[in-house]
Amino acid sequence: MAAIRKKLVIVGDGACGKTCLLIVFSKDQFPEVYVPTVFENYIADIEVDSKQVELALWDTAGQEDYDRLRPLSYPDTDVILMCFSVDSPDSLENIPEKWTPEVKHFCPNVPIILVGNKKDLRNDEHTRRELIKMKQEPVKPEEGRDMANRISAFGYLECSAKTKDGVREVFEMATRAALQVRKRKKRSGCLLL
């Protein structure tokens, strides 16, 4: 039986951990060096609920310089991973300010999984000290859950690509969300207007 094909697009602020999450899931290795993404695609096979799914993983650039290029990733998307970083309250603030309006404009009716990346840094002393200097603290799990409700996300999960904690669960939830959509509506993929 041929695998079902689904397209996943990951969005979020620059340096919030999008590429590491995709690479750890698809290649099982953590990249130690940060290289800003322009456009990358990966393919990963995943089995959920006895279904074989070939997941096309579309990485995007979070930096503002790419705001006009990013929409080219959106057509025919089945699920969105919308990411912020637990060590960056500002990246969580950009979820309703920037990412939700953009995604809902180009991908109406496409399920969104809100993902808190870098959860290993929540209790990291160096991270906490740096945030205190800016009168901030790491994002709490309940703040992530509240945001997921606020943007009507399909679900909320936290993970650490570095420790691999929660990575598989993110993609299992995303795959389930992508599979569910098709039952309701035959063709509700992204539109480019």
UniProtKB/Swiss-Prot annotation:
Membrane topology: Lipid-anchor
Glycosylation: residue positions: 34
CDD domains in alphabetical order: RhoA_like
Residues where Cysteine methyl ester is found: 190
Protein name: Rho-related GTP-binding protein RhoA-D
Propeptide position ranges: 191-193
Predominant location: membrane
Lineage: Eukaryota, Metazoa, Chordata, Craniata, Vertebrata
Top-level division of the source organism's lineage: Eukaryota
Subcellular localization: Cell membrane
One GO MF term: GTPase activity
Annotated positions binding GTP: 12-19, 30-37, 59-63, 117-120, 160-162
